[in-house]
């Protein structure tokens, strides 16, 4: 009896979850580096808004980590740690950052590759998903987003620890190769 109640509870829980089909697609890019290396991509989409909504919720996720910007302002980091069967996303209200006229949504996405920290699950591909709730899907990820791969970040390959090590190897940042202004189209 306990076993059937337990199974019934989790069946009801699973059926109550948001299993709807999202009107956005995962987008990615081809990176020159191999799947073993840290790879970074910069995604961006601009759109004109005639009016600024009171609320504009979006759901956003990436493989592995992202920073999301609206009109150059950092608004979200994520996602929470996931596994390949249960991928997490963040829900963000971007309305306070929108303005009448041209708006730009941008994200930098890191994929740590095969040498990622033990807790960082992923597919070894750079990918981004943005899905807007409601009637304003202008920022949903689709093939109209611009993407740029970057060489400003690299792994610290010379970082060697004897024995078992489950954390990230660390990153090296080269500001000379960073695409300054990409968050707001100020290249």
Please identify what each model-predicted range represents.
Residues 67-122:
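Beta-strand-rich ligand-recognition modules
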Residues 4-13:
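Sec-dependent N-terminal signal peptides
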Residues 37-49, 88-94:
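Short beta-strands within extracellular/lumenal beta-sheet-rich domains
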Residues 15-19:
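Sec/Tat signal peptide C-region and signal peptidase I cleavage site
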Residues 52-54, 95-104, 131-139:
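A short, structured loop/turn motif at beta-sheet edges
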Residues 47-50, 54-69, 105-107:
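Aromatic-lined ligand-binding clefts that engage carbohydrates, nucleic acids, or primary amines
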Residues 30-41, 79-87:
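Extracellular beta-rich ligand/substrate-recognition surface
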Residues 20-33, 108-187:
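An acidic-aromatic loop/edge-strand motif
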């Amino acid at each position: 009896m306990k076993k059937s109640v337990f199974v019934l509870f989790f069946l009801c829980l699973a059926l109550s979850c948001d299993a709807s089909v999202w009107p956005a697609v995962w987008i990615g890019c081809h990176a020159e580096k191999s799947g073993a290396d840290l790879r970074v991509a910069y995604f961006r989409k601009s759109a004109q808004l005639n009016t600024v909504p009171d609320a504009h919720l979006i759901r956003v996720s990436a493989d592995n980590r992202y920073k999301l910007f609206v009109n150059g302002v950092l608004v979200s980091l994520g996602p929470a740690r996931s596994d390949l069967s249960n991928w997490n996303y963040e829900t963000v209200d971007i309305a306070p950052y929108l303005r009448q006229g041209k708006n730009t949504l941008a994200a930098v996405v890191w994929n740590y590759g095969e040498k990622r920290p033990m807790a960082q699950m992923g597919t070894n591909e750079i990918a981004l998903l943005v899905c807007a709730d409601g009637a304003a899907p202008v920022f949903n990820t689709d093939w109209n987003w611009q993407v740029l791969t970057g060489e400003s970040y690299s792994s610290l390959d010379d970082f060697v620890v004897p024995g078992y090590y489950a954390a990230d190897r660390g990153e090296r940042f080269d500001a000379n190769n960073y695409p300054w202004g990409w968050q707001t189209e100020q290249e």
